[in-house]
């Protein structure tokens, strides 16, 4: 059993990740500069969109990977979708670590603690349902 990633999968992750990171930068910059959004709000929107995309990818690939097992070319196409769109694009687009940097660079320590608690609540209350909704939309 081969548990390592193939070169094609690695290239798919790199291509998706670069595209996702560039898209995140464009959207985050646009929301902050053109609409005056605070950094945490723009990053929350980015992460919410990325989480829905991940749910869509997970839902689609989980439904179609099972059916593609009999066809080699269809199976290979399906096999590359998750590394490209799930790990790469959605992973590069979402930026939970940047949110934590924004939280921890706040000047008042009390706001840092509130930010961490707030992110934990938001992750459970918003992002998990968004992932689930994306998977439902994809038919999983």
Curated annotation (Swiss-Prot):
Entry-linked InterPro entries: FluC
Gene: fluC1
Catalytic activity reported: fluoride(in) = fluoride(out)
Regulation of protein activity: Na(+) is not transported, but it plays an essential structural role and its presence is essential for fluoride channel function.
Regions annotated as coiled coil: none
Subcellular localization, as worded in the UniProt entry: Cell membrane
Keywords: Cell membrane, Ion channel, Ion transport, Membrane, Metal-binding, Sodium, Transmembrane, Transmembrane helix, Transport
UniProt source species: Corynebacterium jeikeium (strain K411)
Residues reported in the UniProt entry to bind Na(+): 91, 94
Coarse class of the protein's main subcellular location: membrane
Full protein name: Fluoride-specific ion channel FluC 1
């Amino acid at each position: 059993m081969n548990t390592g990633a193939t070169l094609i999968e690695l290239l798919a992750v790199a291509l998706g990740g670069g595209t996702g990171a560039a898209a995140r930068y464009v959207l985050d910059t646009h929301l902050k500069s053109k609409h005056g959004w605070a950094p945490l709000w723009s990053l929350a929107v980015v992460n919410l969109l990325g989480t829905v995309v991940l749910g869509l990818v997970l839902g689609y690939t989980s439904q179609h990977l099972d059916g593609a097992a009999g066809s080699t070319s269809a199976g290979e196409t399906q096999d590359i979708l998750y590394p490209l769109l799930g790990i790469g694009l959605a992973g590069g687009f979402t930026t939970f670590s940047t949110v934590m940097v924004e939280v921890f660079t706040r000047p008042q320590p009390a706001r840092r603690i509130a930010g961490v608690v707030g992110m934990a609540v938001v992750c459970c209350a918003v992002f998990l349902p968004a992932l689930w909704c994306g998977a439902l939309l994809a038919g999983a």
